[in-house]
Amino acid sequence: MKSEIFDAQLFNALFLCWQNCIHVGLPMKKTWESNQIDWQDITRFLIFIDEAHKIINTNKLEAAEQLLKFEREARKYFGGLIYASQSIRDFVPEGSSQDSINVIKTLFELTQYKFIMRQDSNALDTLSTIFHNQLTETELSHIPRLGKGECILSIKGDENIEFKVDVSEADLAIFQGGA
């Protein structure tokens, strides 16, 4: 598919997601603010973007900027975003301009929770740039040595926690090795 067509379809998909978030979230917000609904009964909206680097990168700034707007506003409507990718370097390819890097950096700065799993050691400079002052030097140097299921949870404005995610055999069977 041509890049222009993909970008147009992506714009439309993200726009429709945003409209749906408002359509669901605005009535929930009004109902919550008028004390007519319990917290646990609020309908929430979540967009999960797997292989996020295909959409969010320095070569697709329109999508990144659209998601920035979503990140800034969605919480008001009980909406959220999850991005998943294997390597931070895919978001910021070599040779990216500082302006485009700043857009990606802001996108991650606005992200409340960041689960950082093992990355290759050649990604450390990019991790340091994108997560500036969010990870200590010790945490950064430990990232390439994280084992299977181990991660660092970086919580915006609070702290970082290193832990291991254990997956049951039943859960593994559901995904059949990630398929």
Predicted regions and their residues:
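Conserved P-loop NTPase motor module
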Residues: M1-K2, Q9-C21, L135, S141-A179
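Conserved P-loop NTPase motor cores
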Residues: S3-S141
